[in-house]
């Protein structure tokens, strides 16, 4: 009888402990624990960060980083299995889908800046980029001033189109800005001569040019609409427990040899599906950000020492 009572007491303690653990969880971690699912938002054409391969599977530098976060979440929650579901997002839908719980991580090419931090949070920086324009060499466009009075494409809902709009107004350039739904559409407008230039993050412009039918016919401006700005994995605002797991996972990754290997894989080697090699070495500023991980939106935080 005493043995049965002891067994009952042990079971009661275990059940209470399990319930207490569940009750202590909040926000995204609790959602994931209850459902056994983590939802990742991906882009379909943000090479090499987040895009679809020939089998329509999301791949890329940011996707690999997010999968490291998934591993950390699984370990944190002591789950035997954690299902990953991928959801497509665009520049216009990524923040709303994060806010309403459709996705838990946005793994793409999203700039961490003060305006976005009013709505969302970011984990540690994984890339630095500046807003520039791409054009055909035959157009002979060398500076931002050369875009005066011309049709220029940029993607809706991006920092790029905002910076283009502000520059257009402040310099009285009279540019006809053509909004595109996705980055690939912005570049396509230049390819098909519907626009003389496309304004995007310089690394995305490089990837589109490299994947075009005639890469040598395009040129990316040295003139920039911005200082180098940080990319980060986007997550919900005011969710410190989930952000802590993501920050720790990315910090460990970036400071390790695996972080360097991951960068080499996507920027210095041939990547699927077309075997492109972007050949973009890691700059001094990004090396510093990897050695000392930070989620700062301030470009000055990334100046090489």
Regions found by a protein language model. Give the residues of each.
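Immediate post-signal peptide segment of exported/extracytoplasmic ligand-binding proteins
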Residues: 22-55, 140-150, 286-305
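Ligand-binding clefts/hinges and TM-proximal coupling segments of bilobed small-molecule sensing domains
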Residues: 23, 159-177, 216-218, 250-305
């Amino acid at each position: 009888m005493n043995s049965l009572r002891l067994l009952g007491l042990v079971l009661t303690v275990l059940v209470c402990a399990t319930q207490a653990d569940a009750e202590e969880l909040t926000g995204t971690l609790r959602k994931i624990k209850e459902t056994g699912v983590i939802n990742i938002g991906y882009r379909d054409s943000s090479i090499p960060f987040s895009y679809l391969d020939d089998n329509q599977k999301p791949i890329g530098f940011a996707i690999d980083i997010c999968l490291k976060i998934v591993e950390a979440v699984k370990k944190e929650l002591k789950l035997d299995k954690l299902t990953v579901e991928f959801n497509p997002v665009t520049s216009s839908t990524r923040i709303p889908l994060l806010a309403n719980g459709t996705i838990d991580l946005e793994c793409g090419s999203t700039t961490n800046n003060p305006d976005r931090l009013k709505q969302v949070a970011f984990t540690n920086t994984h890339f630095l980029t500046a807003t520039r324009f791409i054009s055909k060499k035959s157009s002979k466009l060398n500076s931002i001033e050369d875009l005066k009075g011309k049709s220029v494409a940029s993607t809706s809902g991006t920092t790029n189109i905002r910076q283009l709009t502000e520059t257009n107004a402040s310099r009285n350039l009279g540019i006809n800005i053509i909004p595109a739904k996705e980055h690939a559409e912005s570049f396509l407008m230049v390819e098909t001569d519907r626009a003389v230039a496309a304004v995007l993050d310089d690394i995305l412009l490089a990837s589109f040019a490299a994947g075009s039918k005639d890469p040598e016919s395009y040129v990316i401006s040295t003139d920039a609409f911005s200082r180098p700005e940080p990319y980060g994995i986007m997550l919900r605002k005011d969710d410190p427990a989930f952000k802590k797991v993501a920050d720790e996972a990315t910090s460990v990754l970036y400071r390790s040899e695996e972080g360097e290997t991951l960068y080499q894989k996507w920027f210095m080697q041939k990547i699927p599906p077309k075997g492109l090699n972007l050949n973009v070495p890691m700059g001094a500023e990004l090396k510093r950000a990897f050695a000392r991980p930070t989620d700062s939106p301030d470009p000055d935080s990334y100046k090489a020492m």
